[in-house]
């Protein structure tokens, strides 16, 4: 099994360098299905692979939605119909990718996790992928995805608060994405600002304890938290006139 595991990690690294992310994901799924605790590197390879696979489709969906709005405002009904059909194709792909990683997390990654750090990592991921579903789903499906996302982020936060330092990049990344969830999915800028500010302030207070190896990662996420706070605060002051679509929130 060790030889097979080593081979799949190598193939995943190779696929990443070749920017063949679908294959990167397949290699890492093979390791996840061995039901072993992943190393930090393996965990990151899973995350990077899926982030790229989903990221391309999320970008496509946003572009199509924007074009659809423009065509709608011009009254081009035929074009709007065409875009809707095309957008549905992208949504089907998004749904499939999210379902795939969510089942890997639930069936293999979380059950094999033995540390607080990896537990936070996987629950954060779970929150992220339910959030991506909530971005484009409607009605009950959106409500369900939002609720599942909230549950996963809350579970991650509970473990992060007890097991990880406020300056830990995974805890900071969780706060960043959880606050984006409040802002974009639950339309709650006040809650988003509170969460982001609390995470930022707690990290600042313990900056001395920042380890050298995570210094770059932690300070980068802190910068993103601050950027979002600036954007969201001005949004609140302007009474929500800030267009969320024009400027994407920083995410981890």
UniProtKB/Swiss-Prot annotation:
Top-rank taxon, per record: Eukaryota
Gene3D superfamilies assigned to the protein according to its UniProt record, in alphabetical order: 14-3-3 domain (1.20.190.20)
InterPro entries xref list: 14-3-3 (IPR000308), 14-3-3_CS (IPR023409), 14-3-3_dom_sf (IPR036815), 14-3-3_domain (IPR023410)
A single GO BP: protein localization
Pfam families: 14-3-3 (PF00244)
GO cellular component terms, A-Z: cytoplasm
Subunit note: Homodimer.
Similarity comment: Belongs to the 14-3-3 family.
The name this protein goes by in its record: 14-3-3 protein 7
Naturally occurring in which organism (per UniProt): Solanum lycopersicum
Native organism taxonomy: Eukaryota, Viridiplantae, Streptophyta, Embryophyta, Tracheophyta
